[in-house]
Amino acid sequence: MSSQPKLRILCLHGYRQCDQSFRQKTGSTRKLVKALADFEFVNGIHSVAVDEHSETSRAWWFSNADQMSFSSREPTDVSVGFDESVNAVVKFIEDNGPFDGLLGFSQGASMVHLLIAKAQLGEIKLPGIRFAIFFSGFLSLSSKHDTLTSLRIKDFPSMHVFGDSDEIVARPKSEKLADQFDMEPIRIAHEGGHLVPSMSKHKERITQFLREQMAPIASA
């Protein structure tokens, strides 16, 4: 008897993180749903040069071209390195896919949203990807992304997890991102701050969400 197929989820880390550090930070969540999903991690291609640990400190794009830094709070007219990161993620998916879903934290969550929007506009292809999970997500404040951030995301299941004590990405910003999805998003609030929380209190909800996404692969 063959084992039940698992979902494959591609994970995008936050600003000044990397694939390996994000793997560690998501350990408890991955363990919680290990029977349902396998997780793979992609590394941002841009080093945060001002950080002494630049090899393990990465970004998807920069909002300040002079300092080559990023802020989720300040509007900007630039998105340095964004297009290169889009191409890198698309190439990673082509080389290592297929994947069923995307998961992102903070800037990585914003990147996930922008990738989905670009796919829905037909600008890129994300073969097989049909759902997303966001931790501390937010809408990009770069005017370069206005077409993407104003787009209503259609027919795309999503789960949004945010902290009531998050001082970097306040809950209303994550709620605003969730509002862009026309298919009623799953929203989970936790008491913590800017982190990927233990999801043990919400095991039933995340398990149910993932099981719903498994239907296409179970019938394949």
From Swiss-Prot:
Disulfide links within the chain: none
Coiled-coil ranges per UniProt: none
A GO CC term attached to the entry: nucleus
Segments passing through the bilayer: none
A Pfam family this chain is assigned to: FSH1
EC number assigned by the record: 3.1.2.-
Keyword annotations of the record: Hydrolase
EC primary class: hydrolase
GO MF annotation terms: hydrolase activity
Top-rank taxon, per record: Eukaryota
Active site (record annotation): S106 (charge relay system), D166 (charge relay system), H194 (charge relay system)
Family affiliation: Belongs to the LovG family.
PANTHER family listed in its UniProt record: ESTERASE OVCA2
Protein name: Esterase CBG03338
Protein's organism: Caenorhabditis briggsae
